[in-house]
């Protein structure tokens, strides 16, 4: 009985919103605090979800997007002009990849696809060893990209950007600013 009384005196349940963005279901929770009412929390959570959706669609790795247009140009050996936002994301992702000795590298989109992790239905599979060796021999890396103003070129046609993991981090940073 004492536990029930203490539980009743605890914090009120947070306000929540959920959606499917970047693949899995995400949930946004806003704790009650001074000066924040349910309407303000709802507006902020809606703004976060709109930003998540915008990022998801603008930089989608396999559905038509600004990112797939860049990947197509890289594969063809062409330079490609990108938005200021994408240029900034690429520079930031290059710094993060370099800081970790390229162990986390958004330039390995072909490998991600080969393992079955690019698609509306994820079908993880063991890749054909020959195909895998061919892709590994290309050594694709976001470090192969060169930026001149907002024009991107690549010294490696095997680079395919997939911002999946990186963009989730960017989205969380933006959510923190909004909330």
Q: What are the language-model segments listed below?
A:
Residues 5-164:
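A contiguous, well-ordered beta/alpha segment that forms the leading edge of an enzyme domain
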């Amino acid at each position: 009985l004492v536990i029930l009384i203490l539980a009743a005196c605890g914090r009120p349940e947070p306000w929540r919103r959920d959606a499917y963005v970047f693949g899995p279901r995400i949930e946004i929770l806003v704790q009650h605090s001074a000066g924040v009412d349910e309407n303000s929390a709802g507006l902020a959570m809606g703004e976060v979800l709109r930003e998540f959706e915008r990022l998801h669609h603008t930089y989608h790795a396999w559905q038509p997007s600004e990112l797939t247009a860049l990947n197509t140009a890289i594969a063809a050996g062409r330079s490609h002009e990108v938005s200021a936002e994408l240029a900034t994301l690429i520079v930031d992702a290059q710094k993060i990849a370099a800081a970790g000795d390229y162990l986390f590298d958004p330039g390995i989109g072909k490998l991600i696809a080969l393992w079955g992790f690019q698609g509306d239905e994820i079908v993880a599979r063991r890749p054909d060893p020959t195909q895998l060796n061919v892709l590994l021999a290309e050594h694709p890396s976001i470090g192969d990209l060169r930026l001149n103003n907002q024009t991107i070129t690549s010294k490696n046609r095997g680079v395919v950007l997939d911002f999946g993991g990186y963009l989730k981090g960017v989205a969380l940073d933006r959510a923190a600013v909004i909330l």
